[in-house]
Amino acid sequence: MLDQRLVRENPDAIATELGRRGKAVDLTRLQVIAQQQRKLEEERSGLQAEGNRIGKEVGQKIKGGADPKGEEVAELRQQGNAIKQKVAVLEEEEKHLFTQLKEQLLTYPNLPSPDCPEGKDETDNVELRRWGSPRQEEGLEEHWQIAERLHLFDTERSVRIAQSRFVTLMGQGARLERALINFMLDLHTSKGYREVMPPVLVNSASLTGSGQLPKFADDCFRCSEDDLWLTPTAEVPVTSLHRDEIIPADQLPLRYAAYSPCFRREAGSYGRDTRGLIRLHQFNKVELYWFAHPDHSAEAHAQITADAEAVLQALELPYRVLDLCTADIGFSAQRTYDLEVWLPGAEAYREISSCSVCGDFQARRSAIRTKEGKSTKLVHTLNGSGLAVGRTMAAVLETGQQSDGSVLLPKALVPYVGDERLQPE
C-alpha cells in the first residue's frame, strides 16, 4: 500500500510515478478523501486543544477558591462536555474517511523503482545475462509429448476428476515432481533458509496484505461458505507469518523457503498453453521470501535472484535473466528480475521464476515493522520462485531427452529419483 502521507502531500509526483507503469492514474478521489480527512483532523485537534484549555481553567478556578458546584465552573464544564461530544462525532467521521481512504489506497499498485527500465510492454524488458548453452536440434519433442510417451501424467482422467488445466502425475512423473521439490528445499535450506510449509487456505486479510486483493480476486479460487481462499502462491501466507508484528532489527533478514501447492483460475489465459505443465489451475512451487532491513533490500534482491538461479545451474538448465520494464512488473513489485529457462522442444525461453523487491508496500498493508533502538519502521519484503516445479520438470524433460526415448536426468537429481534416467514403462 502506498504511503497516504506521500499521496496527500505529493499527489502529482505519485501520479507521475504510477504513470510509468503505462496507464494514466487518476488520484482525484483519493485527494478529496485525504483533504477531508486532513480538515477533520485539524478541526478535531483544535477542539481537543480547546477542551484541554477549559479543563485547566476549571482546575485553576477551583484551586483559586471558586465553588466546584458554582455557576461559573458549571458553565465551563458544560462547554467542555459539548466539545467532547463534537470530538466524538469528528472521530467517527474520521474513521469512516480512513476506511474509504484505505479502500482507495489498496487499489493502487506499488511505485516502480527509479532503477526499473522504462517501457510500454514486455518487449521493453532488458536482458541482463545468460547462463549455459541452449540445446538446439531438429526434431526434439516438447515436454508434454515426452510425458505422454513415458506415461508421466494423465490429463484425460484429470479432466474427468476436475476439469481442463489439471494433471495427475503418475509413476515416474510423480517421483520426479517429489524429487524436484525435495532437491529445491534441500538446496535452499543448506544456504540458511528456514523451511516453511504453510496453510494452502488463507483468509482475505492475508491476500490483502500481500497485494492479491482486491485487484486479483477474479484469479483466485474462493471457498464460498468461509472467508478462505486457495492460495495462489506461498508468498501470501508467508507474508502474513509476521503480520501485525515488530521484528527486532538484529533478527533481519528473515529468509524462508516455502513449498506449497498453488491454485489460480488463470482468467484471461484461454487458448494459451493448453497442453502440459506450463499453465495449470493447480501446480507446485517452492517460494523464497525475505523480510529485510530497509537499508539492505537492494543487496537482498540480488541475493534472492542468485539463490533462484542456483537451482537452474545445479540442474544444468540454460536460462536468461530479464530486468522487467515498468509496464511489466507485478502489482506489488518495485523491481523484478525474471528467470526464463530454455525449453529445447518448444524452442523458447519460458518464465520459471520472478524475483521481486517490494519495498515497504506489503509491509504497510500487513503492518510488519522492525525496531532499532527507539525507532520503528516498516520492513522491506522480497519474494522469488525457487522454483516453479512443473515448469522445472518441463525443462528437465526437454533438456534431457535422448534418441532412444529415455530422459537423462541432471546429476544433482539422481540421488533423489534413484535412477539416472526415466525409461519408457
UniProtKB/Swiss-Prot annotation:
Its EC number is 6.1.1.11. It holds the Pfam family Seryl_tRNA_N. L-serine binds at T233, A234, E235, E287, S385. It is found in: Cytoplasm. Coiled coil: none annotated. Its main location: cytoplasm. Keywords: Aminoacyl-tRNA synthetase, ATP-binding, Cytoplasm, Ligase, Nucleotide-binding, Protein biosynthesis. ATP binds at R264, R265, E266, E351, I352, S353, S354. GO terms for biological process: selenocysteine biosynthetic process; seryl-tRNA aminoacylation. Signal peptide: none annotated. It is an enzyme of class 6 (ligase). One of its GO terms (molecular function) is serine-tRNA ligase activity. InterPro entries: aa-tRNA-synt_IIb (IPR002314), aa-tRNA-synth_II (IPR006195), aa-tRNA-synth_II/BPL/LPL (IPR045864), Ser-tRNA-ligase_type_1 (IPR002317), Ser-tRNA-synth_1_N (IPR015866), SerRS_1_N_sf (IPR042103), SerRS_core (IPR033729), tRNA-bd_arm (IPR010978). It catalyses: tRNA(Ser) + L-serine + ATP = L-seryl-tRNA(Ser) + AMP + diphosphate + H(+); tRNA(Sec) + L-serine + ATP = L-seryl-tRNA(Sec) + AMP + diphosphate + H(+). GO terms for cellular component: cytoplasm. Pathway: Aminoacyl-tRNA biosynthesis; selenocysteinyl-tRNA(Sec) biosynthesis; L-seryl-tRNA(Sec) from L-serine and tRNA(Sec): step 1/1. Catalyzes the attachment of serine to tRNA(Ser). Is also able to aminoacylate tRNA(Sec) with serine, to form the misacylated tRNA L-seryl-tRNA(Sec), which will be further converted into selenocysteinyl-tRNA(Sec). Consists of two distinct domains, a catalytic core and a N-terminal extension that is involved in tRNA binding. Homodimer. The tRNA molecule binds across the dimer. Belongs to the class-II aminoacyl-tRNA synthetase family. Type-1 seryl-tRNA synthetase subfamily. This is Serine--tRNA ligase. It comes from Parasynechococcus marenigrum (strain WH8102). The lineage of its organism: Bacteria, Bacillati, Cyanobacteriota, Cyanophyceae, Synechococcales.
